[in-house]
Structures are given as C-alpha cells and as structure tokens.
C-alpha cells in the first residue's frame, strides 16, 4: 500500500505520518517512512538545494520543477518501488500532488509540463492521499514557531492561497483517492479521521 500526505506548510503532516506509522507497526506490518523531495542521499541533496534561501540568485520555476522530478525519479527507483514490490506499506510526506499544487497552481506553470514528467517518470501512484487542510494563516503561524523559514515557507500568503486552491482542485477531481482531513482539529482527532479511511 502506498499512502501520501499533502498540505500547505504547518498543517501537521509530520505528526500524522508518525501516528499512522506507529499504528501500522503495532499491527506487525512493515512500513517505509519517507519524504519528498528527499528519501535517498542524492534526493536529500537536491532537497537542500530546493529549500535553501539564496539571496544571490533566484531559482527559476522550471528549474525548481525539474529538480523536484530529478529527486522524485531517484526516490521512486531507490525507495518506493522496491518497498512496494516487497509488500511493504509506504508512507510518503508529499508526492506528485504537491507538484501540481505548488508548481502549477502556486507558480503558474503549465499542467502540460507536469503531465509530461508524470507520464515519463512516475510509474506508481498512491492508493490513498491524505490532504491536511487548514487556514493558511494558521499553518504559517505553526511554521514560524518551528524556527527559521525555508525558501518555500518564506513565500507570501497569496502563494499559499493558490497552493491550497490547487489541492482543493485535485480533491474535487479525485475524491476516491484524495481524502480531506480537517487540520484545525487536534492531532489525535486528525489521526482518528484518517483511520476511518484506512479501515
């Protein structure tokens, strides 16, 4: 089983993933916990490039998208596909939906570019995607409380409003796969809501 977790900054994805990871392990199931961009040493290096705040050079939107897919291709080949072939449960903090929400909806890149990359480099999709949804201001306040903001977290509220709209578009288009979770609830309540979709 392949499960991904999506949402804007500070909505509690990491907390939910840990709870679901523990839930499956208590059932004796083998679980692989991973994230995007990242998940392998090479992909984590790409992640560092993507998140770094560079005051000397602005990363172009196309470069950002291609770096994310370079990391994703490595992640799929080295982590996700081998785990699924071994009948392990894969829990991924973000996957392709994040690229639609952030790069297409947020940055304004063409969906055709994303579709071309998905067709050529993405051979497996999650069976279930949890979209943790909360007001942008709430999530950003939580992100600020964590400390220094990365390159994405420093974006304006208007950017994250577009990102959230992107997630909403996906949710409405694929309600069977994408499950919206009310991230204004307590972490335990969000976890209980998620479990209902995994029963």
UniProtKB/Swiss-Prot annotation:
Q: Into which EC class is this enzyme placed?
A: transferase
UniProt EC number: 2.7.4.9
Query: What biological function has been recorded for the protein in this entry?
Result: Phosphorylation of dTMP to form dTDP in both de novo and salvage pathways of dTTP synthesis.
Q: What is the lineage of its organism?
A: Bacteria, Pseudomonadati, Pseudomonadota, Gammaproteobacteria, Moraxellales
Q: What is this protein called?
A: Thymidylate kinase
**What reaction does this enzyme carry out catalytically?**
dTMP + ATP = dTDP + ADP
**A single GO CC term, please?**
cytosol
Q: Name one GO molecular function term.
A: ATP binding
The Gene Ontology biological process terms listed for this entry are: dTDP biosynthetic process; dTTP biosynthetic process; dUDP biosynthetic process
Query: What gene is behind this protein?
Result: tmk
SUPFAM superfamilies, sorted? P-loop containing nucleoside triphosphate hydrolases (SSF52540)
Listed Pfam families? Thymidylate_kin
């Amino acid at each position: 089983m392949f499960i991904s977790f999506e949402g804007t900054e500070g909505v509690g994805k990491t907390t939910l993933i840990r709870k679901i990871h523990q839930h499956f392990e208590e059932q004796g199931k083998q679980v692989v916990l991973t994230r995007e961009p990242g998940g392998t040493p090479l992909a984590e290096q790409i992640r560092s490039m993507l998140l770094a705040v560079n005051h000397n050079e602005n990363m172009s939107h196309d470069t950002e998208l291609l770096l994310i897919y370079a990391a994703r291709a490595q992640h799929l080949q080295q982590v996700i596909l081998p785990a699924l072939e071994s009948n392990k449960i894969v829990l991924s903090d973000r996957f392709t939906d994040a690229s639609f929400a952030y790069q297409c909806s947020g940055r304004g890149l063409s969906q055709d570019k994303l579709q071309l990359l998905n067709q050529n480099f993405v051979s497996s999709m999650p069976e279930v995607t949890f979209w943790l949804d909360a007001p942008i201001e709430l999530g950003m306040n939580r992100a600020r409380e964590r400390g220094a903001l990365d390159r994405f977290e420093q974006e304006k509220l208007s950017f994250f409003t577009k990102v959230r709209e992107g997630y909403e578009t996906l949710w409405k288009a694929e309600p069977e796969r994408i499950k919206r979770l009310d991230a204004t609830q307590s972490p335990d309540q969000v976890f209980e809501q998620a479990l209902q979709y995994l029963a």
